[in-house]
Amino acid sequence: MNQVTIQWDAVIALYILFSWCHGGITNINCSGHIWVEPATIFKMGMNISIYCQAAIKNCQPRKLHFYKNGIKERFQITRINKTTARLWYKNFLEPHASMYCTAECPKHFQETLICGKDISSGYPPDIPDEVTCVIYEYSGNMTCTWNAGKLTYIDTKYVVHVKSLETEEEQQYLTSSYINISTDSLQGGKKYLVWVQAANALGMEESKQLQIHLDDIVIPSAAVISRAETINATVPKTIIYWDSQTTIEKVSCEMRYKATTNQTWNVKEFDTNFTYVQQSEFYLEPNIKYVFQVRCQETGKRYWQPWSSLFFHKTPETVPQVTSKAFQHDTWNSGLTVASISTGHLTSDNRGDIGLLLGMIVFAVMLSILSLIGIFNRSFRTGIKRRILLLIPKWLYEDIPNMKNSNVVKMLQENSELMNNNSSEQVLYVDPMITEIKEIFIPEHKPTDYKKENTGPLETRDYPQNSLFDNTTVVYIPDLNTGYKPQISNFLPEGSHLSNNNEITSLTLKPPVDSLDSGNNPRLQKHPNFAFSVSSVNSLSNTIFLGELSLILNQGECSSPDIQNSVEEETTMLLENDSPSETIPEQTLLPDEFVSCLGIVNEELPSINTYFPQNILESHFNRISLLEK
């Protein structure tokens, strides 16, 4: 009897299991009812109660049994009434379970199935975090991913919202983990807002909004490491060759490597251009197996490629000249970064070096041929020399010391000629300033025959000599050898009489007004009113000297008609009175009018400097001395 009962239990269990595998317990034809409190889906770790109520015809159940996943529960079962029982679970932690209950009826050899139900426990979704949308180069899709948080253990759905910032159009995409959105379906421009909403039976959460620009989320095509080689240089180095099919110009990459026995990655970063095959150099330990990975991103952007598949390379024990070897690739993505870089061409590795070597050989051969031609061909050598002489400046090959060709000598000669031409102008500016001026009076000297010889002529003259003597200022010109020291003095006041006729003749020079015609003697008509001592020079010398002073001083602009008349009179007296026997002091008196004109020539006021340059007077007095001799 017991064996029959066991067989019936096995048949019922197999039937239930078969029915569950083809549709679940919920498809069983129930002879009662089963329910779960608080719900069939609940938060993991809660206390739950499962109720079973029988509704079998012609059966008053003696016992009610609970099964979880095909295993009979023997504890925590409570009989509520004749047809109902309860199974209680504390801190239920199983994500999924299948529950059913049976009843023992009188006059039945096996348990009768009442009903069954699936229960689930889990968690509400976390807020989706780290929402990322990228466009892999050449894919044509925008791939959006996010961090879903902890596992919910129950069915959770995610809705991706994409809203255009330009057209305000919003699209929703239902998914369970990530989503690929065709770029052709994004017709709302380049700028979008993206956010993710997560929901399950226990709750709903929404992520933050992500603003994207379609041009900023492009990731270059994957980089691939192709081969490695170790070169025996001064210090052995390993070169890793890698490439990418990207069309993006500015790309930043990272390469990481480590020994297979090590857990720490070494990372190098660099910028590159995939016009050429990339070469990354490493100085590694010999006889050690290393692993390499690489990834890239568009320069200045946020998103990186996933790490490339693993590439293995073992450094040799004794480094040969060049060792090349390709290794298998393992697919493994994660990690850190690195690499220093030099570029090589897309052709073979040694082709660039061979081309450089051939170029150097051709250049050396051509140079040797040209050198031999220059040595044995004289005309060729002469032609080259002429062309070189035309190109280089003359001062590189002129005779040294050939001073006549020197530019410095020519410059000095030009400066010397310029100074000689301007010497007459420069001498006007180098004379010292006259700082001492004194007034003197001529002492009275009255010989015994003074009244007899000169009374008549003095009384018969119509010329107003008293006014001239009172108002005229003269300048004393001393001997040339002692320097020029002018002295200004006035004649004796009115009522004083000179005692010597010779003194009057030498100091006043008062001929008749009509004795000389200004039109017939233009050489003398422009001289100022001044007098010279006749004891030192003759009348001819005085005439020449006065003419030269006229040319130098150009007194026509400053001499008044009265002064010109006095000049004519004084010149006449110089020509008439040339007695060398008279003894008069060597002192020359110059009128103020003459000195005033000289001050104007020097562009200075006569009241400040009533003199003229000494060198000019010296030159003219030297000429007078020569005429005397």
UniProtKB/Swiss-Prot annotation:
It is found in: Cell membrane. Its main location: membrane. InterPro entries: FN3_dom, FN3_sf, Ig-like_fold, Type1_Cytokine_Rcpt_Type2. Glycans are attached at N29, N47, N81, N141, N180, N232, N262, N273. Residues 127-217, 219-318 form the Fibronectin type-III domain. It comes from the Eukaryota. Residues 1-23 form the signal peptide. GO terms for molecular function: cytokine binding; cytokine receptor activity; peptide hormone binding; prolactin receptor activity. Phosphorylated in response to IL23. Expressed by monocytes, Th1, Th0, NK and dendritic cells. Isoform 1 is specifically expressed in NK cells. GO terms for cellular component: cell surface; external side of plasma membrane; interleukin-23 receptor complex; plasma membrane; receptor complex. Residues 377-629 are cytoplasmic. GO terms for biological process: cell surface receptor signaling pathway via JAK-STAT; cell surface receptor signaling pathway via STAT; cytokine-mediated signaling pathway; defense response to Gram-negative bacterium; inflammatory response; interleukin-23-mediated signaling pathway; negative regulation of interleukin-10 production; positive regulation of activated T cell proliferation. Keywords: Cell membrane, Glycoprotein, Immunity, Inflammatory response, Innate immunity, Membrane, Phosphoprotein, Receptor, Repeat, Signal, Transmembrane, Transmembrane helix. Residues 24-355 are extracellular. Heterodimer with IL12RB1. In presence of IL23, the heterodimer forms the IL23 receptor. Interacts with JAK2 and in presence of IL23 with STAT3. Associates with IL12RB1 to form the interleukin-23 receptor. Binds IL23 and mediates T-cells, NK cells and possibly certain macrophage/myeloid cells stimulation probably through activation of the Jak-Stat signaling cascade. IL23 functions in innate and adaptive immunity and may participate in acute response to infection in peripheral tissues. IL23 may be responsible for autoimmune inflammatory diseases and be important for tumorigenesis. It is linked to Inflammatory bowel disease 17: A chronic, relapsing inflammation of the gastrointestinal tract with a complex etiology. It is subdivided into Crohn disease and ulcerative colitis phenotypes. Crohn disease may affect any part of the gastrointestinal tract from the mouth to the anus, but most frequently it involves the terminal ileum and colon. Bowel inflammation is transmural and discontinuous; it may contain granulomas or be associated with intestinal or perianal fistulas. This is Interleukin-23 receptor. The gene is IL23R.
